[in-house]
Structures are given as structure tokens and as C-alpha cells.
């Protein structure tokens, strides 16, 4: 699983001209699922995101987590995080899990964040979305479960 985390002062998703979700201070989380990902990976990444110290404390150091600041999360599925551009000019998405595998894991990721106490909004799975954000910092962090866990669940 891959998550592109962006610390935001606000973010929103619009589908067909209708605002479907928005948050204030928190994180925009673009989530990609690959073949072989599982529920444990989704839960592990949600815990990682909720506890990452990416917000400044009184001294200006990144020392506070999403939970510490009472921030929200906007979770948006994005299979294109698994684009392979090594050959040719058109990206291949063969590594991305099909929708019937990806959707439950994106849902598990969002539900785990909620269970941890993070207010969560979501995009619309599979829809063409207009995603707006004000990146705070900017702080943008790439989380890849295969890299973070050495390819295993350890």
C-alpha cells in the first residue's frame, strides 16, 4: 500500500460540481493499493499516519501528531500511485489492485483512522474527483508499506 500524505490547512473533494467532503487542518491522504495488500497493512499504515509527528509544537519543531492537534483526514483512493513509467510513454497500472480488492482496503484504512479518534472524510471511490488543497508547509510525505516494513509485516 502507498499513501501520499500532505499536511493541509484545508482540503476538499468535488464530484460533478458537488462538494462531497472537506476538512480544515489535518492531512490529505492519497491511498493506493497493490496486488497482495491486506487488512493488516491498511491498519498498520493508518496507525503510522495517525501517530506521525508532522505538526509543529510551541518551539516550531515537528513534534505533534494528527491525534495531538485534533486534525482531520481526507482519504482519497488513487490507483495511479502504482503507475509504472519505466517503459514507453503511457503509464502502466498493472501493479494496482483491481477495484474489488482495493476498495475494502481503502475503507479499512479510513475506518482504522476513525477508530483511533481521527475525524475522517473520504472521496468517492472510482469517481473522477476534483481535489483541492492548501498544502501547509509544504509537508508532503511518501509512505510505502513495502519500504517501511522491509516488505514484511514486521
Swiss-Prot record:
Keywords: Cytoplasm, Hydrolase, RNA-binding, tRNA-binding. It catalyses: glycyl-tRNA(Ala) + H2O = tRNA(Ala) + glycine + H(+); a D-aminoacyl-tRNA + H2O = a tRNA + a D-alpha-amino acid + H(+). InterPro entries: Daa-tRNA_deacyls_DTD, DTD-like_sf. One of its GO terms (molecular function) is D-tyrosyl-tRNA(Tyr) deacylase activity. A motif (Gly-cisPro motif, important for rejection of L-amino acids) lies at residues 137-138. Its EC number is 3.1.1.96. It is found in: Cytoplasm. GO terms for biological process: D-amino acid catabolic process. Gene3D superfamilies: D-tyrosyl-tRNA(Tyr) deacylase. GO terms for cellular component: cytoplasm. CDD domains: Dtyr_deacylase (cd00563). It is an enzyme of class 3 (hydrolase). Homodimer. A Gly-cisPro motif from one monomer fits into the active site of the other monomer to allow specific chiral rejection of L-amino acids. Belongs to the DTD family. An aminoacyl-tRNA editing enzyme that deacylates mischarged D-aminoacyl-tRNAs. Also deacylates mischarged glycyl-tRNA(Ala), protecting cells against glycine mischarging by AlaRS. Acts via tRNA-based rather than protein-based catalysis; rejects L-amino acids rather than detecting D-amino acids in the active site. By recycling D-aminoacyl-tRNA to D-amino acids and free tRNA molecules, this enzyme counteracts the toxicity associated with the formation of D-aminoacyl-tRNA entities in vivo and helps enforce protein L-homochirality. PANTHER family: D-AMINOACYL-TRNA DEACYLASE 1, D-TYROSYL-TRNA TYR DEACYLASE. This is D-aminoacyl-tRNA deacylase. The gene is dtd.
Amino acid at each position: 500500500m502507498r499513501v501520499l500524505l500532505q499536511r493541509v490547512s484545508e482540503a476538499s473533494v468535488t464530484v460533478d460540481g458537488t462538494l462531497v467532503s472537506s476538512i480544515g487542518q489535518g492531512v490529505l491522504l492519497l491511498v493506493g493499493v497493490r496486488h497482495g495488500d491486506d487488512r493488516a497493512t491498511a491498519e498498520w499504515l493508518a496507525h503510522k499516519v495517525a501517530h506521525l509527528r508532522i505538526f509543529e509544537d510551541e518551539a516550531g519543531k515537528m513534534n505533534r501528531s494528527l491525534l495531538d492537534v485534533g486534525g482531520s483526514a481526507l482519504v482519497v483512493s488513487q490507483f495511479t500511485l502504482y503507475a509504472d513509467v519505466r517503459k514507453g510513454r503511457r503509464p502502466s497500472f498493472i501493479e494496482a489492485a483491481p477495484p474489488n480488492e482495493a476498495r475494502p482496503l481503502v475503507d479499512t484504512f479510513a475506518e482504522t483512522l476513525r477508530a483511533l479518534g481521527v475525524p475522517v472524510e473520504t472521496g468517492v471511490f472510482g469517481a473522477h474527483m476534483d481535489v483541492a488543497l492548501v498544502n501547509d508547509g509544504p509537508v508532503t510525505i511518501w509512505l510505502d508499506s513495502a519500504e517501511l516494513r522491509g516488505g514484511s509485516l514486521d
